[in-house]
Amino acid sequence: MVTWIRGEGLHRQAKEWAREHVKRLEEVGITPKLAIILLNDDPVELATQRRFASLKARDVREVGGEAEIYELHDVPPERRTKEALRLIESLNKRDDVTGVIIQKPVPPFVDERALFAALSPEKDVDALTPDNKKRLLDRFDLDNDVLPCTPAGILELFRMYGIEIRGKDVVVVGKGELVGKPLSVMLMQLDATVTVLHALSKEREPYVKRADIVISAVGRPPEIYRDNPWRLTGEMIKEGVVVVGVGGKVDPISGKWHFDVDEKSVAEKASYLTPNIGGVGLATRARVLKNLIRTSYQVARLVVSSRIVGP
């Protein structure tokens, strides 16, 4: 019988922890404020990103912080990078903004590298600036570092449920900058044997079939995409596997979510499985709160006093 890997516990703990630290930060004149930048004008991506952004903003406000969402998807393509860079420069300079998320993916005509190179590492909630990404190549501290939110949330779920990673064959489906790539590096740091599959991988099924852990981070459900769709089903996995579903998109017409993992068939064979609703999404939101608190302390040390001690 499958054990469901639920994110409610992590999310609840993170909110309680963040609420206490918001009070501490306010004592030194800092209120955590998250700025979220939306750049993608693709209807599916925009609908999905708006949903994610609203949930993150709600969490921040519920713990006593503030949140602002900036939508630049209506800016003409030829000007969008320039306008985004101007906004990032402004947010970097504002002492009241203590964390920034550039919601990914950005459209292909936007210079993504330039955006993350311009973002202050101290305010980088997703840990995607060049300086923050380097941390993953050495050692990382799951409890104290600002780390990519979804990968760190998944590792926290594994720890909470006692799921062993060391020495396990792990397949990560998807090599995106937000989840697949950083997660695969983090898993290798934890002594897993990692295989990364993507759209050009040949014969993906044999790798998936023999994996001890499968993490699906594609986000191309067949209900929405005809080009390179992906759906993980029960017939593709072995008995007793651990399955983590990350990818999901919102249909901009119906407003309905569609996911990477066929929950019903996979649950019949998996030993552990994240539910499509209430699993990785909540763990990610928990990590956003933790990272925002940490970036807020970094800002406090810069603008108030270097002697301020945070988590």
From Swiss-Prot:
GO cellular-component term (any): cytosol
Pfam families xref list: THF_DHG_CYH, THF_DHG_CYH_C
Catalysed reaction equations from the record: (6R)-5,10-methylene-5,6,7,8-tetrahydrofolate + NADP(+) = (6R)-5,10-methenyltetrahydrofolate + NADPH; (6R)-5,10-methenyltetrahydrofolate + H2O = (6R)-10-formyltetrahydrofolate + H(+)
The EC number(s) this enzyme carries: 1.5.1.5, 3.5.4.9
InterPro entries, A to Z: Aminoacid_DH-like_N_sf, NAD(P)-bd_dom_sf, THF_DH/CycHdrlase, THF_DH/CycHdrlase_cat_dom, THF_DH/CycHdrlase_NAD-bd_dom
Chain positions recorded as NADP(+) binding sites: 174-176
Keyword list, A-Z: Amino-acid biosynthesis, Histidine biosynthesis, Hydrolase, Methionine biosynthesis, Multifunctional enzyme, NADP, One-carbon metabolism, Oxidoreductase, Purine biosynthesis
Domain of life: Archaea
Pathway recorded for this protein: One-carbon metabolism; tetrahydrofolate interconversion
Gene Ontology terms describing biological process: L-histidine biosynthetic process; methionine biosynthetic process; purine nucleotide biosynthetic process; tetrahydrofolate interconversion
Family under the similarity heading: Belongs to the tetrahydrofolate dehydrogenase/cyclohydrolase family.
Function as written in the Swiss-Prot or TrEMBL entry: Catalyzes the oxidation of 5,10-methylenetetrahydrofolate to 5,10-methenyltetrahydrofolate and then the hydrolysis of 5,10-methenyltetrahydrofolate to 10-formyltetrahydrofolate.
Self-association and partners: Homodimer.
Protein name (record): Bifunctional protein FolD
Originating organism: Pyrobaculum arsenaticum (strain DSM 13514 / JCM 11321 / PZ6)
Organism phylogeny: Archaea, Thermoproteota, Thermoprotei, Thermoproteales, Thermoproteaceae
Gene field: folD
